Amino acid sequence: MRFAIPLGAACAWAGVALAALQIAEDFSSITLNNDRFKAVWSKSKGSVVDMFLDGQDLLGPQSGSTGIGPYLDCYCVPSGFYTAGATNPRMQYVEGTDSTGTKYAGVILNDTYTPTGQQFQQYWFLRDGETGLHMFSRLAYYNETTPFLRNLQEFRTLFRPNTQLWTHLTSSELQTAPLPSKNAVSKQVVVQDATWRFNNTPDDAYYTQFSEYFTKYTFSNQWRDNDVHGLYGDGTNSNGSTYGAWLVMNTKGPLHSDLTVDGIVYNYIVSNHHGEGTPNITNGFDRTFGPQFYLFNGGKGSTSSLQDLRSEAAKLADPSWNAEFYDSIAKHVVGYVPSSKRGSVDGRIKLPKGASNPIAILTVDGQYFQDNSVVPSSYQYWTDIDTSGRFRIDRVVEGKYRLTVYADGIFGDFVRDGVTVRAGKTTTVKEKWDAESAGKEIWRLGTPDKSSGEFRHGVARDPTHPLHPPEYLIYWGAYDWQSDFPKGIDYTIGSSDPATDFNTVHWSVFGPTPDNPNVEYNTTHDWKINFSLTKKQLRNSKKATLTIQLAGAKTASGNTDEYKASEPYINLIHESYINDQKEPLSFVIGFNQSSSCIVRSAVSCYQVRSRMEFPADWLKVGENTLTLHLPYNATDTETAILPATVYVQYDALRLELD
């Protein structure tokens, strides 16, 4: 192996042939190409600036930050955004043959942000016979003078084309649509941060088929469900040949969700749009993220459909895919852990009755699984559990982990700390999950599945457009609270329908929206749940327990986890009143538990829950009422064009008697 060295003035061009794989370098660029795929890196930009599949230009002309990529940027310097390579990009290439006998070549960007000393590395690798780029991204910070810098708020790579080649975008079967036309974009109306209305171009294909509104959040997706996302060209602008550009999510994910594609194909490595925690950048921070794979398929003469090209990409969404190759290039990638330092976990857990869709998660020992980032060096892994309770997770970096299991239909999680993984070994786990219980369940509202999607304007499909996207993905302002619930929420257990009579979000304030300038305060903040109890149910009962699980909540901190003493609702108090009791059952949603959830088209974000006990004699035979209360007209100061109201999104509620 060798690293490229700067070329002297007498040698302006050098090419190195590796059978079908070729490397070329001059003063301004490095080029990698094989029989079908070619990528060109600009040494001055630190990014891919040209890309071709079978001779077809995949990026289009460079214009500012478009027509380039994949490239690395972040929201991680004191001033905010930074694009790796913007200060002093130093580019080099590597080459070799992996353990399978396949030739490879790689390009490595090194850049240091001078004001703080933050070090960025971006790696791109091309293998012979493949039409895509394997990528790793690294950030390091060593600074004893300023040991705490800030949080790593966003860390992402972007494939950002500037061409009419691409005609459709897709992040799932439900989230597939034509790209809005240039005409629609030129006449769009801003309604919210990164959200537009196309009412001026009602004949546009996106409008007629998918939605009147477009936002990058519409195509966000949970990592657990996201194998692949990207762009498709249907041949309209490529002489009939079809093309695909995909980010293969070969590590998948549990509850984390974020942007996937909006004309840009994203790899969101670290982010907090939907309330996930982000790691702090402190002295000694040094993380390498990856691998991820950008695949480009179809090509000259291809007639493959979007679904066909997407399925081809999805077959690669497997953590074991190309493991031998990654081990071979580990010597080039600072911080990548090879297979020799990984082990496996083989488990079987007896699940509670009624559990469905169970998942096993390994995260940092001793912490709630959604708080994995509190230890910046931590790893996480997850896999679905089969119907017999068995699961296996391979390629786990050696160390000590917490095992968390959750399932649809079951309140609470199963947690076990101290699961130790050793390199080259298999750790066996055998457990029984006894579902939490505080007595006899009297009623439940909603399905405990860490989502508020079963309620109104959640996962229900939009009936007004032929592609029928789920309603929650569109834009919260497409719906009108006053029309849906003119008298507020007055729900009766046993007779009301959760899909229509209980909203997917409990607002303190609603509005205005594009079609309704009015702001509603009076019917939003108090919700009533009515239920009947019999003498038999109450007999000998001393204690009652109300469990409330939230799929997301927004306090005055939004999605930043930042404490602002000037904001009265930085910590949000949720209150529940039983019948005519003056004292509520209360729990606090902390500033560091807040999400920007429904306003960014999500029904599952950072989870918050509380189990509250109260005397059974607060209840009575016959009709009872539970009032769910948020502060009246509770708002914050928004710096972006977003609703200022606080809100919560219910996953499920349950009443038990003992």
Curated annotation (Swiss-Prot):
InterPro entries assigned to the protein according to its UniProt record, in alphabetical order: Carb-bd-like_fold (IPR013784), Gal_mutarotase_sf_dom (IPR011013), Galactose-bd-like_sf (IPR008979), GH-type_carb-bd (IPR014718), Polysacch_Lyase_4 (IPR051850), RG-lyase_II (IPR029413), RG-lyase_III (IPR029411)
Decide whether keyword Cell wall biogenesis/degradation is in the record: yes
**Annotated glycosylation sites:** N110, N143, N239, N280, N522, N530, N592, N633
Q: Where is the signal peptide?
A: 1-19
Q: Which residues form a coiled coil?
A: none
Keyword Calcium found = no
User: A Gene Ontology molecular-function term?
Assistant: rhamnogalacturonan endolyase activity
- UniProt KW keywords: Carbohydrate metabolism, Cell wall biogenesis/degradation, Glycoprotein, Lyase, Polysaccharide degradation, Secreted, Signal
What reaction(s) does this enzyme catalyze? Endotype eliminative cleavage of L-alpha-rhamnopyranosyl-(1->4)-alpha-D-galactopyranosyluronic acid bonds of rhamnogalacturonan I domains in ramified hairy regions of pectin leaving L-rhamnopyranose at the reducing end and 4-deoxy-4,5-unsaturated D-galactopyranosyluronic acid at the non-reducing end
* One Pfam family matching this protein: CBM-like
- Compartments, record wording: Secreted
Any one cellular-component term (Gene Ontology): extracellular region
Describe the family membership recorded for this protein in Swiss-Prot or TrEMBL: Belongs to the polysaccharide lyase 4 family.
From the Swiss-Prot or TrEMBL record, give the protein name. Answer: Probable rhamnogalacturonate lyase B
